[in-house]
């Protein structure tokens, strides 16, 4: 109230005023049958949100006063792009193959400020995830042999800083 952290009793303890957030998700898939036995698929996904308040953190007490004046997740962002190639033509090595290359980028953050303190803490995580997955199947007489490969690279970047808000 008037720029000061204040403790106010909620008249309806079952209602968390201002606890909503917005989010959008977009998904698009493209498929293409190049010829018999060769199938391509592209999967694109995008997700983004507004700040997401953590009211459970705001109800924590330190003595008789709130522990935090602010505690929320910053906007969360996620991008996925995956290309899959499916082969069903018989070769010496396989009868069926499914190979997927994918990238996923994620950014999320956490922001908090202790009650009646003028320092806001920011923690930001950025992840870049690259994957390759290959599955193969070969029939040999009455038997079926399955084998594959799974590889991934995770790049994680975490940063933190404090902001003086006055």
Predicted regions and their residues:
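Surface-exposed beta-strand-turn/loop segments characteristic
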Residues: 1-21
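Short, flexible, mixed-charge acidic loops at enzyme active sites
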Residues: 2, 58-59, 159-165
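Flexible loop and strand-edge segments within Gram-negative outer membrane beta-barrel domains
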Residues: 17-23, 33, 37-94, 105-127
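Transmembrane beta-strands of outer-membrane beta-barrel proteins
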Residues: 40-42, 95-101, 143-149
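Transmembrane beta-strands of outer-membrane beta-barrel pores
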Residues: 46-50, 103-107, 140-142, 151-157
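Short, conserved acidic/polar surface loops in the N-terminal third of protein domains
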Residues: 111, 157-160
């Amino acid at each position: 109230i008037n720029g000061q952290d204040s403790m106010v009793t909620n008249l309806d303890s079952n209602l968390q005023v201002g606890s909503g957030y917005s989010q959008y998700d977009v998904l698009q898939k493209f498929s293409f049958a190049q010829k018999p036995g060769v199938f391509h698929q592209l999967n694109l996904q995008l997700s983004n949100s507004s700040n997401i308040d953590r009211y459970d953190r705001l109800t924590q007490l330190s003595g008789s006063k709130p522990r935090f004046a602010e505690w929320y997740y910053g906007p969360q962002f996620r991008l996925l792009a995956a290309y899959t190639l499916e082969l069903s033509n018989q070769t010496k090595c396989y009868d069926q193959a499914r190979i997927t290359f994918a990238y996923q980028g994620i950014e999320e953050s956490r922001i908090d400020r202790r009650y009646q303190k003028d320092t806001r803490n920011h923690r930001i995580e950025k992840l870049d995830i690259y994957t390759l997955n290959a599955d193969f199947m070969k029939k040999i007489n009455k038997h079926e042999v399955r084998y594959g490969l799974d590889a991934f690279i995770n790049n994680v970047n975490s940063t933190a800083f404090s902001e003086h808000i006055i």
